[in-house]
């Protein structure tokens, strides 16, 4: 990808007004497809392709693909992993997320006084979440994106929209600032880290930008 252009929505046959353009650059002599610039920001990486800085955050890594810390100058997040390489905790000293797994599937997350329990179908698609003792149900599209969270009456209390790469465009609904903000399962059912806007895919981290 050399550039990404965003146009206003239209039903016409030709694109509407151009709203934004993001340019990508690749300049590494040893690794031709390694991203070195994004939207005017310089990106640096280590020898195995882990990002070290993106113009906003700086990153440190352990044991290959395990993100150890990330810092934006004022806040540092530190991650902890279990023996299987699954992330079990991330904290910045004042806010702490704790994660529990059933096999490789996230089964429980706690942040502050809020605890969420997750259930999946046989294919691994998220089905339901219990949030502070109340059951809610996920609505997903054909590629597994969580597009809404429903209460037991079938009313959508949270709705998410994404771009084609998983960047969250909107979070709406009567519980957008509570359940909508705390729920980590978003695009393709991946675990979303709100503070960094990265998705945690266990074997790697994914930046939708």
Predicted features by range, described:
Residues 1-37:
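Conserved catalytic cores of ATP-dependent inositol ring kinases
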Residues 3-10, 35-41, 52-57, 69-74, ...:
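Beta-turn initiation residues at beta-strand->coil junctions
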Residues 15-20, 73, 85, 93, ...:
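Residue-level signal for glycine
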Residues 24-28, 131-202:
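A motif-centric feature for acidic-aromatic and gly/ser/thr-rich catalytic loops and repeats
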Residues 119-131:
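Trp/Tyr-centric glycan-recognition "aromatic platform" motifs on solvent-exposed beta-strand/loop surfaces
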């Amino acid at each position: 990808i050399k550039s990404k252009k965003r146009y206003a929505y239209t039903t016409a046959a030709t694109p509407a007004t151009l709203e934004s353009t993001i340019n990508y650059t690749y300049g590494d002599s040893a690794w031709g497809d390694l991203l070195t610039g994004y939207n005017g920001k310089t990106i640096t990486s280590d020898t195995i392709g882990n990002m070290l800085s993106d113009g906003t955050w700086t990153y440190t890594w352990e044991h290959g693909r395990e993100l150890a810390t990330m810092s934006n100058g004022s806040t540092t997040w530190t991650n902890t992993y279990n023996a299987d390489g699954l992330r079990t905790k991330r904290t910045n000293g004042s806010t702490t997320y704790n994660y529990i797994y059933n096999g490789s599937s996230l089964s429980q997350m706690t942040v502050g006084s809020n605890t969420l329990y997750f259930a999946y179908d046989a294919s691994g698609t998220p089905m339901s979440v219990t949030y502070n003792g109340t059951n809610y149900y996920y609505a997903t599209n054909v590629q597994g994106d969580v597009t809404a969270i429903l209460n037991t009456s079938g009313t959508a209390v949270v709705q998410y929209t994404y771009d084609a790469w998983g960047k969250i465009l909107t979070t709406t609904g009567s519980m957008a600032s509570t359940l909508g903000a705390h729920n980590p399962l978003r695009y393709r059912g991946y675990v979303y880290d709100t503070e960094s806007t990265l998705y945690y895919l266990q074997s790697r981290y994914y930046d939708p930008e």
